């Protein structure tokens, strides 16, 4: 099944169809923004300092897993500074002319937000360096012997870059951001406040316990929490429930196959495949992809991260391996310790692995 045809998951951290509705419940100021305390406090200080000096805020790099509020925070920065906001993404800026058009239309101190900034092409990055450092744009006009260099002065501006893969950002680009900020997963109590706020905006009567039930199943991600909240509203609304409590919210989410830990049917199918078909691993990701009918990048980017974060899955040099917690989650007894140690040290395991260096898909 190709990625465009793959069923969308409610617990997907990346944007999916229907997520446009989340804009209606986004916070509009740092005071309304819940969670990310250190990021908020630091940004507040830097914004106050920039406003006091009547200067553009230094360039900001927001990095972390998807769905944690990087776009929302960029919009809030512009609102707190009381300046204009322009948004684009790395893949959209295909050539230097596209970037030049964006930069030359900025007003003094405006915020330019580039999502997926790690996907900028090298040619565009080269143009961006002097724009960020000196607020100047160096362009080549014409071709061949008639080509000439033109320098355009730009108004001071703030570039806010966002990425889920900070390791792919080149070092020269990374060093030009004066304010790098890492976004962390949210605690259930923080997500409970976010869910409760969203319910109020949506006109939904949700108890505190109901909000916490949704929060616990949201994978530490506000985007997932908002998505689950809207689906709970749909199910409970059709059922005629005026007030949604923990039992009603839990029942709705169980109906959607999202369990108390935030795992869905695809997560369980993945874990079951390793346990039942490959003796708990180690097994290569290409083999798993073939068994599940999924591409490697789908497994690595959308399924495995949360399983690893929760301690149910381990990546080893020989492939994927269920942890003791993974076995217990499936209701299975963990294997004997000596066999597990042999797998981790590279010995032949129940997954039928090959000696290190001969495997094709770890």
UniProtKB/Swiss-Prot annotation:
Residues 187-257 are annotated as: Small ATPAse domain (RuvB-S). Keywords: ATP-binding, Cytoplasm, DNA damage, DNA recombination, DNA repair, DNA-binding, Hydrolase, Nucleotide-binding. Residues 4-186 are annotated as: Large ATPase domain (RuvB-L). It catalyses: ATP + H2O = ADP + phosphate + H(+). ATP binds at residues 25-26, 67, 70-72, 133-135, 176, 186, 223. Mg(2+) binds at residue 71. Transmembrane segments: none annotated. Its EC number is 3.6.4.-. DNA binds at residues 296, 315, 320. GO terms for cellular component: cytoplasm; Holliday junction resolvase complex. PANTHER family: HOLLIDAY JUNCTION BRANCH MIGRATION COMPLEX SUBUNIT RUVB, PTHR42848. Belongs to the RuvB family. Has 3 domains, the large (RuvB-L) and small ATPase (RuvB-S) domains and the C-terminal head (RuvB-H) domain. The head domain binds DNA, while the ATPase domains jointly bind ATP, ADP or are empty depending on the state of the subunit in the translocation cycle. During a single DNA translocation step the structure of each domain remains the same, but their relative positions change. Homohexamer. Forms an RuvA(8)-RuvB(12)-Holliday junction (HJ) complex. HJ DNA is sandwiched between 2 RuvA tetramers; dsDNA enters through RuvA and exits via RuvB. An RuvB hexamer assembles on each DNA strand where it exits the tetramer. Each RuvB hexamer is contacted by two RuvA subunits (via domain III) on 2 adjacent RuvB subunits; this complex drives branch migration. In the full resolvosome a probable DNA-RuvA(4)-RuvB(12)-RuvC(2) complex forms which resolves the HJ. NCBIfam families: PRK00080.1 (NF000868), ruvB (TIGR00635). This is Holliday junction branch migration complex subunit RuvB.
């Amino acid at each position: 099944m190709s990625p465009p045809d793959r069923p969308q998951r409610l617990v997907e951290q990346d944007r999916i169809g229907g997520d446009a509705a989340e804009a209606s419940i986004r916070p509009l100021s740092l005071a309304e923004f819940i969670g990310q305390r250190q990021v908020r406090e630091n940004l507040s200080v830097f914004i106050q300092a920039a406003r006091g000096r009547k200067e553009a805020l230094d360039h900001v790099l927001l990095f972390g897993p998807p769905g944690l509020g990087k776009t929302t925070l960029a919009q809030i920065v512009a609102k707190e500074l009381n300046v204009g906001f322009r948004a684009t993404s790395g893949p959209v800026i295909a050539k230097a002319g596209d970037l030049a058009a964006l930069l030359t239309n900025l007003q003094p101190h405006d915020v330019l937000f580039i999502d997926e900034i790690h996907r900028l092409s090298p040619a565009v990055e080269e143009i961006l360096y002097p724009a960020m450092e000196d607020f100047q744009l160096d362009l080549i006009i014409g071709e061949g012997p008639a080509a000439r260099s033109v320098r355009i002065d730009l108004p001071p501006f703030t570039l806010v870059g966002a990425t889920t893969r900070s390791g792919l950002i080149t070092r020269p680009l990374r060093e030009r951001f004066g304010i790098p900020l890492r976004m962390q997963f949210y605690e259930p109590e923080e997500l409970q406040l976010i869910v409760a706020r969203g319910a109020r905006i949506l006109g939904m009567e949700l108890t505190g316990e109901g909000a916490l039930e949704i929060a616990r199943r949201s994978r530490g991600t506000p985007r997932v929490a908002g998505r689950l909240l809207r689906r709970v509203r749909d199910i409970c609304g059709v059922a005629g429930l005026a007030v949604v409590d923990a039992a009603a919210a839990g029942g709705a989410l169980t109906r959607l196959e999202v369990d108390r830990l935030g795992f869905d049917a695809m997560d369980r199918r993945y874990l079951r495949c390793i346990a039942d078909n490959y003796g708990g691993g180690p097994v290569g990701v290409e083999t798993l992809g073939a068994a599940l009918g999924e591409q490697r990048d789908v497994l690595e980017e959308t399924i495995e991260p949360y399983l690893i974060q929760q301690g149910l899955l381990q990546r080893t040099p020989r492939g994927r391996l269920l942890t003791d917690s993974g076995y217990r989650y499936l209701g299975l007894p963990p294997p004997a310790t000596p066999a597990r140690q042999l797998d981790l040290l590279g010995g032949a395991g129940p997954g039928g692995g090959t000696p290190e260096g001969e495997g094709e898909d770890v």
